[in-house]
From Swiss-Prot:
This is Heat shock protein DDB_G0288861. Residues 99-666 are annotated as: Disordered. The keyword Phosphoprotein does not apply. Gene3D superfamilies: 2.60.40.790. Belongs to the small heat shock protein (HSP20) family. Residues 40-179 form the sHSP domain. CDD domains: ACD_sHsps-like.
Length: 722
């Protein structure tokens, strides 16, 4: 005990102490042990320690101004109580005092280091050979804009490009170099030209690994001649991929061509995707945003972008099948410059033309399988690769989609194209116009009429890029049904989200769930025990089903109590929160009458925290029950019957304590020293326990209670400490 007192003293906690002393001897503050027959008189420096010495026990209470951490070793040797604590770990503090110990200092210093380092590079590139060049790249932008520094975990190159373009839009030929430190510009370019394919932080930037991107770009170029719609998508995707991957060797050759439309880059990255890894979907959304509705960046940047992060962008590279990617391995890098120059102006010039709308109608397809040829050709039969990828897509994307039910922006009228690009993906925000689909989508995909579309909406949402589902067949394809069988988690997710979108509202489904749950709860106890029904024959027959269900809970409780003594506290809360009817008083009567007998039959081992937790809520429950029940009780018979069990409660509740506490003697609860914040308002009850040679320690409501008894066990007396 003295060691705790010593380092409390060194903390400067000079709170005066009240204590009752019986005895003459006192020990100096530097001693490491306390003779048991002495009471401490020189404890003025301690924070509120009560030391109570009775005939057979010494009770020490410390009220600690802080948090008591885990490991305090307590030994009893030859009538001496020795408490040892490591001062560095216990960081006690006054309310206005900052943490001042070693581990805390290390934490604060490390956080300062991470703030001073360039943005998120410390975390992103811990294993990266290019750390130096990349941190040099990012230093200026992190100094310019602290917001970018915080939000840019996966985005380092994008925000870098974006900052330069927005601040210097008139320098089209310098999108990348102007942000570099001049000393490191040449070396960093050389390093960046070597694609660091396998590095994980690189994959975090781009949302998908590099070799797949190159091959997917080649696949796109092969399809370029087939469909004019794709011609508009490709330059955006390639630009965003190349800007997000500074390591692409193509990108250095074409930097001038990429940098010409500074509006495109600004719209791609400035508004929409500062906060997320770049993906072709975000760049498509962003460019659409700047060109068709320039005045709506706020709704764009706040709401729609979150699902894209958890959409299959992160999944996509991994879920695409190997045979798709390995089919087209020949390099077509010679086409890149012309292709980009050809098509950079098309999306801007075609904003309001049908081809642009065709592009937007396929946006959901892009979101999950951005560069997948089979999904863009709308083949009538789903490839195996898509069946594979869709399973993972729906798992990833569904949970995030439910967050957006209430966030549908108010300016929907102004956002028809953008919102539908988003909503045709995995979000339930597509519901408002599910009954009347936009002309763009119907005309371009050659769907049947709109009723089939809205009725198949959950099908569309769970399999965004399944070609068979996008042909809107009137019955779900077999591939979908197969897809939902193997993966149970996905099936649950899809069902829940389809309820949100096309079925009843969230509150209705929740009501339905609660009703089902209550019905099950009511069925189970009746099967368990019908015998206790006879106890309720005195009661009026008008009691509801839920009340009769509560009748049987004592039987459940007793089963639980045999295994988990901690459940008592929870049960008392259940009693309070459930309808306060006369049923509860019967419940308590049965429960209390059976309680001492059980304890005699089965000695249990309860840790000291559990006893201190058990006894307080039960006594508090006695007080809170009577007013509630008398207010609610419809008949006058009930209060009279209620008072009888409560009179029985109080004597019977104190009797089982000796039995519980006798079993506690062998166990010092190690869990008592946890992180408990001090709460002054709760009642402090001390139970004198006999532990013979061992010490019982409590940490209850901010009190450290250390009790050591000298004599064999006697029936316990409650010692209230004020």
């Amino acid at each position: 005990m003295a060691t705790i007192m010593d380092f409390l003293l060194r903390q400067g906690l000079n709170v005066p102490v009240g204590y009752s002393s019986v005895g003459s001897q006192s020990t100096s503050s530097s001693s490491t042990s306390i003779p048991m027959d002495s009471s401490l008189r020189n404890v003025d420096y301690l924070p509120e320690i009560d030391i109570t010495e009775t005939k057979d026990s010494l009770i020490i209470e410390c009220e600690l101004a802080g948090v008591l951490k885990e490991d305090i070793s307590i030994e009893v040797a030859e009538s001496k109580l020795i408490i040892k604590g490591d001062k560095k770990r216990y960081a006690y503090r006054r309310p206005n005092q900052s943490w001042s110990y070693d581990d805390k200092n290390q934490i604060s210093q490390s956080s300062k280091i991470s703030e001073q380092s360039s943005g998120a590079d410390q975390w992103q590139h811990s294993n990266d050979p290019n750390v130096d060049s990349q941190s040099n790249l990012n230093m200026p932008s992190s100094k310019q804009d602290p917001n970018v520094q915080q939000s840019r975990v996966g985005n380092v190159p994008e925000s870098k490009v974006n900052r330069n373009d927005t601040t210097e839009p008139n320098l089209p030929s310098q999108p990348f170099q102007s942000d570099m430190n001049p000393s490191s510009s040449s070396s960093s370019i050389e390093k960046q030209q070597i694609p660091n394919v396998s590095h994980p932080s690189f994959q975090q930037w781009s949302g998908q690994p590099q070799p797949q991107q190159q091959q997917q770009q080649q696949q796109q170029q092969q399809q370029q001649q087939q469909q004019q719609q794709q011609q508009q998508q490709q330059p955006f995707e390639q630009q965003s991929q190349q800007q997000s991957n500074l390591n692409d060797p193509m990108q250095r050759q074409d930097s001038k061509e990429i940098s010409q439309p500074s509006e495109l880059q600004r719209s791609n990255f400035g508004e929409s995707s500062v906060n997320q890894p770049s993906s072709s979907s975000s760049s498509l959304l962003g460019s659409d945003n700047s060109q068709s509705n320039v005045d709506l960046p706020s709704s764009r940047s706040v709401e729609p972008q979150r699902p894209n992060v958890s959409d299959s962008d992160t999944n996509q590279g991994y879920s695409q099948s190997v045979e798709q990617r390995l089919g087209n391995t020949q390099q077509q890098s010679s086409q890149l410059p012309q292709q980009q120059q050809q098509q950079q102006d098309q999306p801007r010039s075609n904003v309001n033309e049908p081809s642009f709308q065709q592009w937007s109608s396929q946006q959901d397809q892009h979101r999950s399988n951005v560069n997948d040829p089979s999904s863009q050709q709308w083949s009538s039969q789903p490839s195996e690769q898509q069946q594979k990828s869709n399973i993972s897509e729906s798992n990833v994307s569904q949970p995030s989609s439910t967050q957006f039910v209430e966030n549908i922006p108010s300016n929907l009228e102004q956002l028809p194209q953008q919102e539908q690009q988003r909503s045709n993906g995995n979000e339930p925000s597509s519901q408002p116009w599910s009954s009347q689909p936009s002309e763009q989508q119907r005309s371009n995909i050659n769907e049947p009429p709109s009723q089939q579309w809205s009725s198949k909406q959950d099908q569309q949402r769970s399999n965004v890029n399944d070609p068979s589902s996008q042909q809107w067949s009137s019955r779900p394809s077999e591939q979908q049904q197969q897809q939902q069988k193997p993966n149970i988690g996905e099936l649950n997710v899809n069902q829940a989200s389809s309820d949100v979108c096309s079925g009843p509202s969230v509150s209705e489904t929740r009501k339905q769930f609660e009703e089902n749950y209550l019905n099950e709860q009511q069925r189970q106890p009746q099967q368990q025990d019908l015998s206790s029904l006879h106890k309720d024959e005195k009661k009026p027959s008008s009691s509801s089903v839920s009340q009769t269900a509560q009748l049987f809970e004592p039987n459940k409780r007793e089963e639980q109590r045999k295994d988990k003594p901690e459940e008592k506290k929870f049960d008392s809360d259940i009693i309070k929160s459930s309808e306060p009817t006369n049923v509860e008083s019967i419940e308590n009567k049965d429960w209390i009458q059976q309680k001492p007998q059980e304890q005699q039959q089965e000695p249990r081992e309860i840790s000291s925290t559990e006893t201190s937790n058990l006894q307080q809520p039960m006594e508090r429950q006695i007080n809170t029950e009577t007013p509630k029940e008398q207010q609610v009780s419809p008949q006058q018979q009930q209060p009279q019957q209620q008072q009888q069990p409560q009179q029985q409660q109080q004597p019977q509740q104190q009797q089982p304590q000796p039995q519980q506490q006798q079993q506690e003697r062998k166990y010092i609860s190690e869990r008592t020293f946890g992180h408990f914040k001090r709460t002054m308002d709760l009642s402090k009850m001390l139970y004198r326990l006999n532990l013979r040679e061992e010490v019982q320690t409590h940490f209850v409501n901010g009190l450290l209670i250390i009790i050591l008894n000298k004599k064999p066990f006697e029936p316990s007396i409650k010692i209230p400490v004020n």
